[in-house]
């Protein structure tokens, strides 16, 4: 199975019609649809919920939460889970809250109780109220230690703090990396994959496209093909079968998501 762990229906600066999102996801067996911070959380979650309900066999929703201002009660999040959401996505940097804020820690207790995996989204665009420091993967260390049963995904390998993300993935059994691929940034992809391979954590990375920013098919082709670009160089390569394993990883099983 091919699971895309990183897609959106909308994102600041990008939009895609739901029917176009579904067409772009054709090469995939399933994909995560992350609610976006470009509108209030309830509206964004409603948009994703309606889309997921139309395609329950393929689309899996991650509800956005800003624990500082949103409802983080068990009752509310039990209801969220009942509407087709399988996890939560947090935009600590762009929404300006520390990942270990006291309200955030309260939310993690709820997520732990409801068995919700957490996706920490890291990439720009960042607005004037964003705090770049809050996307640093090292800040998740306390969370991963305290809530060992929560599966944590570091979005986009923690860019621009990739090395921190790799250390976190290596350090914690319950922490994983989202390898969102940029076909126009092959060198960036190469360095990230090679660093993860050399650190022995390639087996804990999940494939992501970042749709609508990139199309899944282009991302798959980029991953499978970048070794060819290095054929006439002396640069180290990563075994093709290891790269294919990223694309075909049983992400749902690893995260404990029933689908």
Region roles according to the model:
Residues 9-16, 36-43, 65-72, 95-102, ...:
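Acidic-and-aromatic substrate-binding clefts and catalytic sites of carbohydrate-active enzymes
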Residues 6, 48, 52, 80, ...:
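Conserved, mostly hydrophobic/aromatic
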Residues 16-21, 42-50, 71-75, 137-139, ...:
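Alpha-helical scaffolding within the catalytic cores
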Residues 43-131, 175:
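Active-site gating/metal-coordination segments in enzymes
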Residues 86-87, 100-207:
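Catalytic pocket-lining loop regions of alpha/beta-barrel enzymes
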Residues 7-9, 34-36, 63-67, 89-92, ...:
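A cross-domain feature marking catalytic cores of carbohydrate-active enzymes
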Residues 3-7, 12, 19-41, 58-66, ...:
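Divalent metal-dependent hydrolysis catalytic cores, especially in the metallo-beta-lactamase
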Residues 1-8, 16-30, 199-204, 218-259:
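Mid-to-C-terminal alpha-helical segments outside catalytic/metal-binding sites
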């Amino acid at each position: 199975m091919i699971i895309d762990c990183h897609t959106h229906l909308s994102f600041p600066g990008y939009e895609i019609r739901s029917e176009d999102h579904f067409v772009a996801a054709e090469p995939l067996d399933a994909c995560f649809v992350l609610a976006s911070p470009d509108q209030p959380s309830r509206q964004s979650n409603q948009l994703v919920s309606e889309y997921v309900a139309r395609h329950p066999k393929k689309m899996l929703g991650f509800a956005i939460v800003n624990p500082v201002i949103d409802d983080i009660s068990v009752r509310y999040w039990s209801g969220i889970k009942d509407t087709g959401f399988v996890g939560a996505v947090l935009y600590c940097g762009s929404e300006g809250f520390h990942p270990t804020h006291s309200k955030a820690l309260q939310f993690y207790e709820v997520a732990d109780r409801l068995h919700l995996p957490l996706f920490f989204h890291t990439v720009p665009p960042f607005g004037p109220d964003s705090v770049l420091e809050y996307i640093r993967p090292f800040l998740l260390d306390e969370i991963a230690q305290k809530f060992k049963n929560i599966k944590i995904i570091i979005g986009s390998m923690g860019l621009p703090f990739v090395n921190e993300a790799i250390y976190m993935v290596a350090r914690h059994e319950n922490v994983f990396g989202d390898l969102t691929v940029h076909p126009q940034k092959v060198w960036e992809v190469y360095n990230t994959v090679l660093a993860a391979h050399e650190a022995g954590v390639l087996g804990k990375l999940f494939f992501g496209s970042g749709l609508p920013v990139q199309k899944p098919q282009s991302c798959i082709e980029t991953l499978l093909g970048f070794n060819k670009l290095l054929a006439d160089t002396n640069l180290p390569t990563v075994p093709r079968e290891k790269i294919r394993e990223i694309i075909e990883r049983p992400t749902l099983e690893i995260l404990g998501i029933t689908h």
